[in-house]
Amino acid sequence: MVKETKRMIQAKKGIELECKGWEQEAVLRMLYNNLDPEVAEKPDELIVYGGIGKAARNWAAFEAIVEQLRTLEKDETLLIQSGKPVGRFKTHEQAPRVLLSNSVLVPKWAHWEHFNELEKQGLMMYGQMTAGSWIYIGSQGILQGTYETFAELARQHFGGSLKGTLTLTAGLGGMGGAQPLAVTMNGGVVIGVDVDRSRIEKRIATKYTDRITESLDQALAWASEAKAKGEPLSIGLVGNAAHLHHEILQRGVEVDVVTDQTSAHDPLNGYIPEGHSLEGAELLRKENPQRYMALAKQSMKKHVEAMLAFQRRGAIVFDYGNNIRQVAKDEGLEEAFAFPGFVPAYIRPLFCEGKGPFRWAALSGDPEDIYRTDRLIKELFPENEALIRWIDIAQEKVTFQGLPARICWLGYGERMKMGLEINRLVRNGELKAPIVIGRDHLDCGSVASPNRETEAMKDGSDAVGDWAILNALINTAAGGSWISVHHGGGVGMGYSLHAGMVVVADGTENAEKRLRRVLTTDPGMGIIRHADAGYELAKQVAREKGVMIPMEDKNEEGV
């Protein structure tokens, strides 16, 4: 196994190229961006977010990827296997420049034990979703989805606002760190628990969290005062949720909403067992990994028991996609799935319309390029009041991490329209450099994850993985700049397959053709996937938008 060497990487900015074209340069800059200290959780270990979600297998592989990208021709394609460059072929100019497959295991061996053995041997890397596919943009990447989730929850249960409510959650890493700001954006008070003080401090630095304390008494006092005044406030509480949630229950504190985004998907590297410090957990993890995992799983069970107790007391409780319910059930907690996942509870209607987390980053590094695209959004979709409100909130609240970037949920037709107009701005010189356009793997038609995105599908097709593979295949055929297929993101080994796409708007006619195709096929997959599962809204959208579904009228007969 190659010995790791610590290094520090920073996102490259400006208009001077290291590579032979902007498309290759875009890949390189987004790889760097994933590992920028402003962006990544543990950049010296190549870990971007989500437990051990990495950008490259090791530093030797990272250096090899960089060298390949610097010399890659505009008609060549580089192949990445779990964070390591393994091949390079001449293809054509409208083919992807990079194709990536991360963490993919044959189903019988798709579990953490086998993955960990392969990783020890230097044969595999965990790519999470956007870590190994080089399109992570920091906590903003999940922020609007989190905001929309809490907004829909507020509409369903609290009259449209979280004002005067208290949300309890845990896990303030790269993904979970969006929760505090999303709650306060919706007017609520939130206590976010994390055992790692440095993670909360990072959220404080980026203005995603307002306050930090190691005292439960202090956290509850702050929360009570803000709740009584109807003022938004986010509090980062240092501690272990498996313990603190039960303590809050014992005190009889009225909690209105409970969820969780700890790294429960990975019982070895993600979740800290109750009663262990970070240092003690690290030592146990190395000395006795089996014991560590057993303790972590028991703590997760206790954590879910607390969530169920809050639900019985009247709180709105939902799973935020980290597979903690499954672990608790495997540990003997039969009622672990008594509370729903966030997708069937709040997000699926958006998926039926082909909507999802559309994102873009300014390769120039100049925030003004993003502010120009913010104005473009308002020019293109003036009737979408929720979208315009989101852009205003993002401009006020979001601190850029690494390369300036923006995210907003756009649907079928809207994504293509936005992409083509961004390309026009680049061509006309209104933006200083090309723009990278991509998305999370958590999208309407790119993931199979029975405990998250595809939980409780209408036709029972939760575990059908074909859709994620078809998404990658059609986006490759359509000419995405880099396309990825991953396994295990969000929920861990054995529980998900998912695909990512990125396309570069460099102002050229070539880019225009690719944007037109990819930004149609990609959200189109969401519509056909949900129409095939029997969702009437998706069928209606398909008819209205002209999305061809050959056997739509046959699907109801089980064909």
From Swiss-Prot:
Main location: cytoplasm
Keyword NAD: yes
Pathway assigned in UniProt: Amino-acid degradation; L-histidine degradation into L-glutamate; N-formimidoyl-L-glutamate from L-histidine: step 2/3
List of catalytic residues: 408
Role according to the record: Catalyzes the conversion of urocanate to 4-imidazolone-5-propionate.
Family, similarity comment: Belongs to the urocanase family.
Protein name, entry field: Urocanate hydratase
Gene: hutU
